[in-house]
Regions:
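Hydrophobic pocket/interface hotspot
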Residues: 29-34, 40, 83, 121-123, ...
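Hydrophobic ligand-binding cavity/cleft-lining segments
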Residues: 1-59
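Short amphipathic alpha-helical segments
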Residues: 26-32, 75, 138-145, 149
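Glycine-rich portal/gate segments that line the openings of hydrophobic small-molecule binding cavities
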Residues: 10, 51-98, 151-160
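A general secondary-structure signal for short beta-strands and their flanking turns/coil
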Residues: 14-16, 57-59, 76, 103, ...
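Hydrophobic/aromatic beta-strand elements that line small-molecule binding cavities or substrate pockets
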Residues: 18-21, 50-52, 77-85, 105-112
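Beta-strand/loop substructures that line and gate deep hydrophobic ligand-binding cavities in soluble
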Residues: 95-144, 148
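Solvent-exposed residues in well-ordered beta-strands and their adjoining turns
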Residues: 22-26, 65-69, 84-86, 97, ...
Length: 161
């Protein structure tokens, strides 16, 4: 599976990571998987829980807990995210309300690739760790996780279509 990735070091110590996957999964199945917030932890690796706690017309709040084994230690982090859905543009933006990161924001985007019957699935994340979580130490892990997340979403989308 070919995944294009970029990683950028930002001036404030944050990292911006982006990953893109081309898939034959349909827009509707990808959208349905990405917006099934209460079940994301069932197929996204290292996501222990995901729970929608508020929703109105365009915004929702989701609490998520992720877990990692890093250098033999189990590490978990919690985030409360504000999400904004634009289905007509295939876009889900997210911003940190509060949590174990100083910054955790970005978007998921589904884009159709002209004349191919395929879609591009993009995950773009800007993240800044806390004092006890130096981002430089975990950036390789984050890059791998972004790829794993894309593959997991694609696999689930093909199952539901």
């Amino acid at each position: 599976k070919t995944i294009e990735q970029t990683m950028e070091k930002l001036t404030d110590g944050a990292r911006r990571l982006a990953a893109q996957l081309t898939t034959t999964a349909s827009f509707d199945s990808l959208w349905s998987v990405l917006t099934d917030y209460d079940r994301l932890n069932l197929f996204i690796p290292n996501l222990l829980s995901s729970k929608k706690i508020f929703r109105n017309e365009t915004n929702l709040h989701v609490r998520q807990v992720g877990s990692q084994d890093f250098l033999g230690l189990k590490f978990s982090a919690e985030v409360l995210l504000d999400l904004y859905e634009e289905k007509e543009n295939g876009l889900i933006k997210f911003n940190l309300i509060k949590g174990d990161f100083r910054k955790f924001e970005g978007y998921w985007k589904i884009q159709s690739i002209s004349n191919t019957g395929k879609n591009s699935l993009i995950y773009d994340l800007t993240v800044k760790g806390c004092q006890w979580m130096p981002i430089g130490m975990i950036e390789k892990r984050l890059k791998r996780d972004l790829s794993d997340n894309l593959i997991a979403v694609e696999r689930q989308a093909k199952l539901v279509s």
